[in-house]
């Protein structure tokens, strides 16, 4: 694997949009790009995580988190450590720990961030909870358990303790503005490798 890029942030922050824009940039350079958007629908862990996210209650919260973690680990194992992978882009990664209860989330993040691969191209798209909710509601999709203003505010607050290793990009801006900031950081990172 030659290039590892990660996007994370609240639902509705524009992760998938930015994944597609940066993938397009690398594909135009003739690079092979693999995209993993967690939870992934191509394996049982991702599907079970998504099913639990569409339900409510503490048990489903725990199930969603556990299966999400297994889904992400599967992607790391199958793609990050694959010598045939050129550019690997993840939509959602370690910030899922922000959904865990206080104190537990800090401990789990420290463990996860020391075990899983990192990159200088990890982007936290920092959208306001209000803008996040507006974007979520405009999608006309089934609502997940954390897609309400109260939970979005809590989760955004919790992410502040874990984004110290990330490039924090304000995400209330237009997609093109965000994309240019992301591209500038990725290009600078690529130049270090030359």
Regions found by a protein language model. Name each.
Residues 97-100, 104-157:
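A glycine- and Lys/Arg-enriched "phosphate-lid" helix/loop adjacent to the NTP-binding pocket
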Residues 34-110:
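ATP-dependent small-molecule kinase phosphotransfer cores
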Residues 23, 130-194:
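NTP-dependent small-molecule kinase module
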Residues 12:
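Walker A (P-loop) phosphate-binding loop of P-loop NTPases
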Residues 18:
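Hydrophobic positions on the alpha1 helix immediately C-terminal to the Walker A/P-loop
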Residues 7:
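Hydrophobic anchor at the beta1->P-loop junction of P-loop NTPases
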Residues 15:
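Conserved lysine of the Walker
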Residues 24-33:
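Post-Walker A helix-loop "phosphate-sensing" segment adjacent to the P-loop in P-loop NTPases
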């Amino acid at each position: 694997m030659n290039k590892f890029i990660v996007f994370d942030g609240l639902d509705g922050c524009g992760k998938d949009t930015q994944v597609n824009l940066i993938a397009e940039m690398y594909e135009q350079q003739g690079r092979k790009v693999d995209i993993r958007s967690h939870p992934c629908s191509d394996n049982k862990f991702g599907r079970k995580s998504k099913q639990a996210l569409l339900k409510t209650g503490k048990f489903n919260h725990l199930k969603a988190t556990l299966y999400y973690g297994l889904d992400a680990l599967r992607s790391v194992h199958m793609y990050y450590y694959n010598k045939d992978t050129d550019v690997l882009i993840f939509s959602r990664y370690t910030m899922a720990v922000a959904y865990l209860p206080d104190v537990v989330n800090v401990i789990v993040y420290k463990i996860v961030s020391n075990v899983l691969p990192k990159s200088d191209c990890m982007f936290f798209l920092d959208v306001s909870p209000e803008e996040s909710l507006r974007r979520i509601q405009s999608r006309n999709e089934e609502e997940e358990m954390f897609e309400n203003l109260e939970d979005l505010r809590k989760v955004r607050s919790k992410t502040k303790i874990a984004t110290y290793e990330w490039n924090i990009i304000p995400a209330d801006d237009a997609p093109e503005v965000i994309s240019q900031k992301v591209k500038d950081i990725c290009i600078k990172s690529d130049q270090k490798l030359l």
